[in-house]
Every structure is written in C-alpha cells, then in structure tokens.
Amino acid sequence: MKALCFEQFGSPDVLQYKEIHDPIINPNEILLRTKAIGLNFADIYRRRGAYHLAGNPPYILGYEGSGIVEQVGTEVTDIAAGDRIAFADVPFANAELVAVPKEKAIPLPDAISFEVASSVLLQGLTAHYLTQDSYKIKAGDFVLVHAAAGGVGQLLIQIIKMKGAHVIGLTSSKEKADAAYSAGTDHVCLYSESWCEEILQITKGHGVDVVYESVGSTLEESFKATKIGGTVVFYGMAGGDPAPIDPRMLMDTSKTLTGGDLWNVLTTYEERKTRSHQLFDWITTGKLHVQNPTTFSLENGADAHRLLESRKSTGKILLIP
C-alpha cells in the first residue's frame, strides 16, 4: 500500500509518500480501505516531535478517517466486507489501508458521506464533550470560543447556539470572522485588537461564563475575559505553550481551569457509537452544518500540512488516498 511517512522530525518537507507493507490484522480487527482521512493539529505536533510517537521509523501520522471494509478478523462477527466504517482514534491513518480494532469501528449511515464523516468525527466529538462534559452549556450563558473559524470552533458555535447560549468568537482576520458569523456566532473579536476589553463591553463588564481555549499562548488573557466564578476549558495550544497560571488567582476569583482530552471520554465502544450517532443525527436533520472541507491527495500531504500550519485555512482539511 501507499502511505505518507516520515523518518525524522521536522517541517512538512520530511513527509514522504511511498510504498510500504500492508497491515496484518489481528483477530479482533478489520482492514479498512480509506476513502477520506482527517488532518488535525496533533499530526503537526507529532511530525515536529512535540508529541510522543511509539515504535520506530518510518512513522505514519493520522488517526481519523473513513472507508470500506476489505477484510475482517476471525473474531469479528458484526462487521462484514463492504461495510462503511469511520474511526476517530486509530493510529497510522495516513495510508491506503488501516487496521481498525472492532471496538473503534463506527458504523457509517448511508446519509453521511466519507468526506463528512472524516470532517466531523474527531472535531465534532471534541465539540460534543467540551459542551457536555468539560463545561455543560446552559441557556443564557455567554461563551467565548477561540479559533472560531476553525473546524472545532465552527462546530462549537453551532452546538452552543443549539443549547440557547450566546457566543463570542475570536479569529485572526476579517475573512475568518465571516466564517465564524456563518456558523452562527453572535459577535466576533479579532486577536489583533483589544479583545479582552471588547468582551467585557459585550458582557456589560461581567465577563463570559466559559472560555473554550485552544490557542494556549492566550490563556492568561482568557482568564481576564472570564467572569468571577467562571471557567476556562483548556484543550489545545495551537498558538504556543501557555504561561503558568497562579493558583492564588483561581482562589481569589473563584475561577476554574479545567482540561479536556477526548481520549479520556471515548473509553468504550458505546461512548464512541452513541456520541458519533448524535452528531450524525444533528447533521442529517439540519441542526449541524459541516463546512465543505479542503482536500488534498494523500500524495500531496505535505502541502496540506503547510496550509494547516499557516493558520489561513477555515474548516477541515482532508487527505484523499
């Protein structure tokens, strides 16, 4: 099979598209021929060497995608060759063939395309647990969403509005502000302006109930924009490492800092299936809109990495084998 690999950490230039051995599946796995593969910031971090990678080179990135079953293991009885399957937490996805454990194989309804599934699963499941588990959104809440034009940001906006809350989005450009408004945000502030002050004005001096913080380097400012007793949910650091937070500030202001990691939520097959199918239901009933993705061939994966790193993209980037 063909795969997008790398031998050493570095820039997108280290990525190579080459022939490697097909995966050999275990009895409890299926062999999936991928039709669409999601690109995520975690792939960037791993390519740079910022995240741990198991095994030895050549490394294969990716852990989200969808496709058609080619073969099933001897212990798999409820999945058959030809079935449409998606996955959100399986390694080595940047390849034509992926071995998927049966408990991580999410059945794909006919109404959901491979492109939509690979656009929404990881980011949609992230937005789902952030608004359900990390901080349960209530009607009337004021919510600040960082990187509001990104894939998670646009889905967060829609789910938050679905729950009856007010959304303030943060973006890096007026073009991205348009994407955030299209997703349904009530206000947009730009990183290049005095956004903390703007948010305090919008909230009549109180601050927001919760901040969904995915930039990292803006963590201190996020707390300044949060009301007394409010919450900051830290779930990413696309803009760099955060400055240390003084726990005395948390005590004095009764503010809460909480973290979020999808893998601590998707611990069972039922969790994966139930949460995924709620996303699929929202999409098929028109409650959740998924922006058309930007697609690259798997062979041109380095260009996809460059676009994602540039922070000029909006919505999801997909690799097509």
Functional labels for PLM-detected ranges:
Residues 11-14, 19-66:
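N-terminal glycine-rich beta->alpha transition that marks the start or flank
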Residues 66-90:
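A glycine-/small-residue-rich N-terminal strand-loop-strand element
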Residues 86-147:
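NAD(P)H dinucleotide-binding glycine-rich loop of Rossmann-like/cofactor-binding domains
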Residues 120-193, 216:
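Mid-domain Rossmann-like dinucleotide-binding core that forms the NAD(H)/NADP(H) cofactor-binding site
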Residues 195-205:
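Short amphipathic alpha-helix with an adjacent loop that forms part of the alpha/beta core around
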Residues 218-287, 320-321:
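Glycine-rich phosphate-binding loop and adjacent beta-alpha segment
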Residues 287-294, 302-321:
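C-terminal capping/lid region of NAD(P)-dependent oxidoreductase domains
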